[in-house]
Amino acid sequence: MNETNDNDIDQLIYLFSKLPGLGIRSARRIALYLLQDKDVRLKSLINNLVEIDKKIVKCEICGNMDTENMCRICSSEYRDKSIIAIVETVAELWAMERSGNFKGLYHVLGHNLSAASRQNPSILRLPELLTRCFAENIKEVIIATNSTLEGQTTAYFITEYLKEHPAKISRLASGIPIGGELDYLDEGTVSAAINLRQPFE
């Protein structure tokens, strides 16, 4: 397959190459770095991954990742519990948190909708969202899906789904470029998009 002729090393390189942002060359460098000091580097990584796997759970309310069943955001008494931002994944939640400009709650969908693949809307956590909106007396829902075609499709579907709830529905400002994803934007851009959010039409 390659120069090493070692299936185990090939498998390690392959696994790293599947991580976001890593190609085969970067994966090969990481694998070599770990194997050159296997007893320290590789074992330390393995032990830490095992511990993380034991501790990290999905928040049963919003879908964030934390060490408790209710994440620190949902359990905080300092958050504005009348506003909820809908994000596609935890990556977008983290991006909004890095901006330091959003103090409300979140709802992680876990997916988006693609017209091309004809995904079933049931993959989204919308029944849970509607239940939260009524139970927590939500006043504003900020749709913070990405500015991709899939994100826009998802946003329109969410708006239709929430029609029976009286909350104001807004969308992040158009400063986010078309096709842009929150996770790749700097904190200033995300902060401005939150501040300048507009009613969803």
UniProtKB/Swiss-Prot annotation:
InterPro entries, per the entry: DNA_Rcmb_RecR (IPR000093), Rcmb_RecR (IPR023627), Rcmb_RecR_Znf (IPR015967), TOPRIM_dom (IPR006171), TOPRIM_RecR (IPR034137)
Record GO biological process: DNA recombination; DNA repair
Keyword entries, A-Z: DNA damage, DNA recombination, DNA repair, Metal-binding, Zinc, Zinc-finger
GO molecular function: DNA binding; zinc ion binding
PROSITE patterns xrefs: RECR, TOPRIM
Residue ranges occupied by any Toprim domain in the UniProt entry: 82-177
Coiled-coil parts of chain: none
Zinc finger (C4-type): 59-74
Stored PANTHER family: RECOMBINATION PROTEIN RECR
Function: May play a role in DNA repair. It seems to be involved in an RecBC-independent recombinational process of DNA repair. It may act with RecF and RecO.
Similarity comment: family membership: Belongs to the RecR family.
Protein name: Recombination protein RecR
